[in-house]
């Protein structure tokens, strides 16, 4: 009789022995085979006795848009890939819980004070070009926009992409209220505006543009992985806009303790060592940078709006951009 019911008993008991699943929403290049995602997944799963499930979306702004749409019904335990420019907008959703991670655990330019969002890397937006093809790159954002040179440019949409939003804010920092006219001039040189970074950079590598919006650290990938030194980031005299990428756990998480454990793991060497040669950004912890990073130019001037300024103006500036580029 016992034999008859044994399979049923085992079936009923199976969920009790199943590993908990931590669902992390992130952007596509983080979760890609060539991104830091696989190494992070392996390291965390070895430590947590759980399954780490990475759900990839196109880019950082898309993460916030998705979470807003899902609200408290979201399956995300952690959202990884928002940034300093989305902090206030993300806070206003009331969909994120306090991290449990001390601010002293991270090191970013200007310091960090936030008990909800935890940085995992940082970098500076820049336009990347191929030195073998473009001999005289622009030396400033104004030169890129205003020069008679017929440079072909690709950048990302500020409505879906954090680099795209970064360029929107960079243009505002440099041009102020004259940004609409600057956008119109840049539109004449723009090949396309993509939803996310991966698509834009892929098109650039295929020769579709002379310059692509990316990061000052992007050339490190080509130096280290491909042994090529022909890619460079144009150093702009006005300075470069800072991006600090962050993660946070959700209020709706069914695994709050595991989510907090992940955020603490995120600032540990096991995670941070995957950042320089996985996400090609600067780590927020004291880990050694690989050879190749020392040749990268660091901006003399760092540009940044406060999260509150961005939240107050973002929609108006996006509308301004839309009107300007559609003329």
Swiss-Prot record:
Pfam family, any one: SBP_bac_1
Protein name (database record): Thiamine-binding periplasmic protein
SUPFAM superfamilies: Periplasmic binding protein-like II (SSF53850)
Knocked-out gene: effects: Insertions in thiBPQ cause a defect in the transport of both thiamine and TPP.
Annotated positions binding thiamine: 59-60, 161-162, 197, 215-218
Family: Belongs to the bacterial solute-binding protein 1 family.
Keywords carried by this UniProt record: Periplasm, Signal, Transport
Gene3D superfamilies for this protein: Periplasmic binding protein-like II
GO molecular function, one term: thiamine pyrophosphate binding
Signal sequence annotation: 1-18
One record GO biological process: thiamine transport
Inducers of expression: Expression is repressed by thiamine.
Subunit structure: The complex is composed of two ATP-binding proteins (ThiQ), two transmembrane proteins (ThiP) and a solute-binding protein (ThiB).
Keyword Cell cycle: no
InterPro entries (alphabetical): SBP (IPR006059), SBP_1_CS (IPR006061), ThiB (IPR005967), ThiB-like (IPR005948)
Function description: Part of the ABC transporter complex ThiBPQ involved in thiamine import. Is also involved in thiamine pyrophosphate transport.
Subcellular location: Periplasm
Domain of life: Bacteria
